[in-house]
Amino acid sequence: IGGGVATYLLQFAKAAGAMVYVTSRSQEKLAKALQYGAEKGLLHDEDWVEAMGGGKVDVVIESVGAATFDKSLDAVRRGGTIVTFGSSTGDLVTFDLRKFFYGQYTLKGSTMGSFEEYEAMIRFVEEHDLHPVVDAVYPAEQFKEAFQRLESAEQTGKIALQIG
């Protein structure tokens, strides 16, 4: 957890009634995620299944890519789903295909969705009064500093540019 999409996904999942576990490289970001409602925060380099007490999850939202895909597959229950929308650590992953089909997993790629899905999302946001977490707002002239903060991956939430 850390970026704007991940923090918003945490809010969406909580509003939908899900029990939410998040992962991060940063203890500080995990602490913030707990403040936003996550049940548990897992460090990226620990055994996620062990950290969850041996349990597995119904759905994994995978936004990192190659560096965490295998751990995501290990953490999802038999018949569960992995939804992927990002690949910041690499586009190519390899995984045990036999384990995948014996596990009866579903793998779903996602981008922006359809117009109908967008409308449903807007209704959900309004109904649950969701607001994105904003880490920092920079004047447009400081766009380089804003991108440096984004590149550093130190933010928790959105980085915004103020225009005008």
Where are these regions (language model features)?
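C-terminal hydrophobic helical "lid"/dimerization subdomain
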Residues: 115-164
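Hydrophobic/small residue at the entry helix of a nucleotide-binding pocket
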Residues: 4-5
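Rossmann-fold NAD(P)-dependent oxidoreductase module
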Residues: 8-12
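A general structural signal for well-ordered alpha-helical segments in protein cores
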Residues: 30, 57, 69, 97, ...
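Residues in the short beta-alpha loop(s) of Rossmann-like NAD(P)-binding domains
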Residues: 26, 88, 113
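Conserved helix-to-beta-strand junction in the class I
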Residues: 74-76
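Adenosine-nucleotide cofactor-binding segment
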Residues: 1, 14-71
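Rossmann-fold dehydrogenase core element
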Residues: 78-83, 94-134
